[in-house]
Structure formats: structure tokens, C-alpha cells
Regions:
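Short, polar N-cap/turn motifs at the start of nucleic acid-interacting alpha helices
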Residues: 62-64, 146-166, 171
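Flexible interdomain linker/hinge and immediately adjacent N-terminus
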Residues: 1-19, 97-98
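Basic, Lys/Arg- and aromatic-enriched nucleic-acid-binding interface segment
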Residues: 12-46
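DNA/chromatin major-groove-contacting recognition/catalytic segments
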Residues: 84, 88, 168-180
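Active-site/catalytic core of tyrosine-dependent DNA strand-transfer enzymes
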Residues: 14, 86-124
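Conserved tyrosine-mediated DNA breakage-rejoining catalytic core shared by Y-recombinases
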Residues: 55-91
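Short, basic (Lys/Arg/His-rich) helix/loop patches that form interaction surfaces
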Residues: 23-30, 112-152
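Alpha-helix N-cap/helix-start motif at helix boundaries, enriched for small hydrophobics
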Residues: 39, 47, 51-56, 150
Length: 180
């Protein structure tokens, strides 16, 4: 049986998820809400893999002033790279006392699944940790970031992997933005 085509959420929908997380009332025993919000921002706005986001340490900023905003990241296969994290995201992380390894990927996945249900996001629109990374890649590719640069930002060993993200996003956008 063929799996139906999953569509990436639009930037507007991700802003809606962002607002939902910020504005919803606290539930009892909901200690990880802000941790998950920080993960949401790191995956969506910085393009980190969920494992990279969980282990992100804002104390590992590049020491040189000309590289302010670049943070050392230990990525897939224990490879190290520098990634840019916007000052606004660092401010949010600090305001919520972010520490590496406060949660796990399963809890974050469940958090996003619950947000999708509560926002009544249609089944054909995917909302998962890796989807946020794909949205980051898609947005930057469609806004002119060269593929080799995007490859480095995402930490892909092969540019073909990055090209698959972009190809998939273009196919989805053909469906989303059909000409009249």
C-alpha cells in the first residue's frame, strides 16, 4: 500500500505552532514545555538535527569576536562543525535555563504530535523533529542559499543529500503554489 505524500508545513503554520507553544496554558506536570520549545527553535530556525539540538551547548561559542554567533556542534558521527545560531534564539535558551540533554527525541516527537492534534493540522502535513530541519533547508534553498553552503550548514557529507531536500521541497511547492 502506498503511503500518502506528506507535505511540509508552511512558514505561517510553523509560526502558528510557535504561538501555540508560547501561549497555551500550562498543564499539570508539564516541566519540559520550555525545553521542547527551545528544541523547536533549534530545529526550525537553525536547522539542527534533533540529536544535535538536544546536545547543543551555547557555552561553546567561537572565541574570536569576528565569528560571534557561531557555535561548535558535535553532529552525526561525532563530527564537529560550527553553526550559526541567531542571538534571539540564544536569548530564549538562556531565559529558559537551557542545558544540554534535558530531554530525548521521543518526548520531543510526542510533544510535536500533541501540538499537531491540538491545532487540528491535517494528516497530510507532517510535523516531526526532522520536518523542522527540512523546513529550514527548504526556506533557505528557496531564498537563494547556494547548495554547497546549505550542505555545510546542515552538516551533510554529500551535496546529493542536500539536493534531495531541495528537490523534495520544489515538488511540494509545485503542488502548493500551482499556477492559475
Amino acid at each position: 500500500m502506498n503511503k500518502p505524500l506528506q507535505q511540509l508545513p508552511s512558514p505561517q503554520l510553523l509560526n502558528q505552532v510557535n504561538d501555540y507553544i508560547i501561549n497555551r496554558k500550562n498543564k499539570r506536570h508539564e516541566s519540559k514545555r520550555w525545553i521542547h520549545y527551545c528544541l523547536f527553535l533549534l530545529c526550525w530556525k537553525a536547522g539542527l538535527r534533533v540529536s544535535e539540538a538536544i546536545n547543543f551547548d551555547y557555552n561553546l561559542e567561537h572565541p574570536a569576536p569576528e565569528y560571534k554567533g557561531l557555535y561548535l556542534l558535535r553532529g552525526k558521527g561525532s563530527k564537529e562543525r560550527y553553526v550559526y545560531i541567531a542571538p534571539q534564539i540564544i536569548k530564549v535558551l538562556k531565559s529558559h535555563n537551557w542545558q544540554p540533554q534535558q530531554t530525548n527525541r521521543i518526548n520531543f516527537f510526542e510533544f510535536l504530535r500533541e501540538a499537531k492534534e491540538n491545532l487540528h493540522i491535517p494528516a497530510h502535513i507532517e510535523l516531526a523533529p526532522h520536518t523542522l530541519r527540512r523546513c529550514f533547508a527548504t526556506y533557505n534553498a528557496l531564498n537563494g542559499m547556494p547548495l554547497p553552503v546549505l550542505q555545510n550548514v546542515l552538516g551533510h557529507a554529500n551535496v546529493r543529500t542536500t539536493a534531495l531536500y531541495v528537490k523534495a521541497s520544489r515538488l511540494e511547492n509545485l503542488l502548493k503554489f500551482k499556477p492559475i
